């Protein structure tokens, strides 16, 4: 059975020409056809940017609320006090606290995907940098997770906000949905992310900014996107 599945996957993967770029709509269709794993694969994008990643003023970091969500169930923890505690809970936060939440995190209990904090609680959150930082959970105003509007931040996280940043090679990796999404939904999610990354272009960046766009499913082949079909 396994050999049969492998052969089928190979046949599907052969549909993808490695040296060809595809219009976005065609790339998404191919990815869905090639994704034959027994689980609902994620669909990921890799965006190679024409920046000097060694320079801090060209590093890109941000967040996009995908119009159709990411397909993930997101658990949100919020550092808040006063009225913001109830606001966070009403917006759907899973965990809300301050010193008690900090103690929980220091004890290794990190059962959440996003951490949001109000500015005045950063005196507590700042001490957790060595724990939250390596996990990509440290609140940051650049991605809207340090904010006075905790209700909106929680709702955004729950509705499918994705965070992104350039790696050391100037590449952004991000998930835009799941294989079971409608093709149109994946296309709109991709374009929402791409538009935000375009807006974030550093003034110091020279030459072609969006150098290469690649889509893939968790277990599938990478498919290069024709940049002219997405206004890149």
Swiss-Prot record:
<keyword id="KW-0689">Ribosomal protein</keyword>
<dbReference type="GO" id="GO:0022625">
    <property type="term" value="C:cytosolic large ribosomal subunit"/>
</dbReference>
<dbReference type="InterPro" id="IPR016095">
    <property type="entry name" value="Ribosomal_uL1_3-a/b-sand"/>
</dbReference>
<keyword id="KW-0820">tRNA-binding</keyword>
<dbReference type="InterPro" id="IPR005878">
    <property type="entry name" value="Ribosom_uL1_bac-type"/>
</dbReference>
<dbReference type="GO" id="GO:0000049">
    <property type="term" value="F:tRNA binding"/>
</dbReference>
<comment type="function">
    <text>Protein L1 is also a translational repressor protein, it controls the translation of the L11 operon by binding to its mRNA.</text>
</comment>
<protein>
    <recommendedName>
        <fullName>Large ribosomal subunit protein uL1</fullName>
    </recommendedName>
</protein>
<dbReference type="InterPro" id="IPR023674">
    <property type="entry name" value="Ribosomal_uL1-like"/>
</dbReference>
<dbReference type="InterPro" id="IPR028364">
    <property type="entry name" value="Ribosomal_uL1/biogenesis"/>
</dbReference>
<dbReference type="Pfam" id="PF00687">
    <property type="entry name" value="Ribosomal_L1"/>
</dbReference>
<keyword id="KW-0678">Repressor</keyword>
<dbReference type="GO" id="GO:0003735">
    <property type="term" value="F:structural constituent of ribosome"/>
</dbReference>
<dbReference type="GO" id="GO:0019843">
    <property type="term" value="F:rRNA binding"/>
</dbReference>
<keyword id="KW-0810">Translation regulation</keyword>
<comment type="function">
    <text>Binds directly to 23S rRNA. The L1 stalk is quite mobile in the ribosome, and is involved in E site tRNA release.</text>
</comment>
<dbReference type="GO" id="GO:0006412">
    <property type="term" value="P:translation"/>
</dbReference>
<keyword id="KW-0687">Ribonucleoprotein</keyword>
<dbReference type="GO" id="GO:0006417">
    <property type="term" value="P:regulation of translation"/>
</dbReference>
<comment type="subunit">
    <text>Part of the 50S ribosomal subunit.</text>
</comment>
<dbReference type="InterPro" id="IPR002143">
    <property type="entry name" value="Ribosomal_uL1"/>
</dbReference>
<dbReference type="InterPro" id="IPR023673">
    <property type="entry name" value="Ribosomal_uL1_CS"/>
</dbReference>
<comment type="similarity">
    <text>Belongs to the universal ribosomal protein uL1 family.</text>
</comment>
<keyword id="KW-0694">RNA-binding</keyword>
<keyword id="KW-0699">rRNA-binding</keyword>
């Amino acid at each position: 059975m396994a050999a049969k599945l492998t052969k089928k996957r190979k046949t599907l993967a052969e549909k993808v020409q490695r040296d060809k770029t595809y219009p976005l709509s065609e790339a998404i269709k191919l990815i869905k056809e090639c994704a034959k794993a027994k689980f609902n694969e994620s669909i990921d994008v890799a965006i190679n940017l024409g920046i000097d990643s060694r320079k801090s003023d060209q590093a890109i970091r941000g967040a996009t609320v995908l119009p159709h969500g990411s397909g993930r169930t997101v658990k949100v923890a919020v550092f808040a006090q006063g009225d913001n505690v109830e606001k966070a809970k009403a917006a759907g936060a899973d965990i809300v606290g301050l010193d008690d939440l900090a103690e929980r995190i220091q004890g290794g209990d990190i059962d959440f995907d996003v951490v949001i904090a109000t500015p005045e609680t950063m005196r507590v959150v700042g001490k957790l940098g060595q724990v939250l930082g390596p996990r990509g959970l440290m609140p940051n105003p650049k991605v809207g997770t340090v904010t006075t509007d905790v209700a909106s931040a929680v709702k955004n996280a729950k509705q499918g906000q994705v965070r992104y940043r350039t790696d050391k090679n100037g590449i952004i990796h991000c998930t835009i949905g799941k294989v079971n999404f409608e093709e149109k939904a994946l296309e709109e999610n991709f374009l929402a992310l791409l538009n935000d990354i375009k807006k974030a272009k550093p003034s110091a960046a020279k030459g072609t900014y969006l150098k290469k766009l690649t889509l893939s499913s968790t277990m599938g082949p990478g498919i290069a996107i024709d940049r002219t079909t997405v206004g890149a």
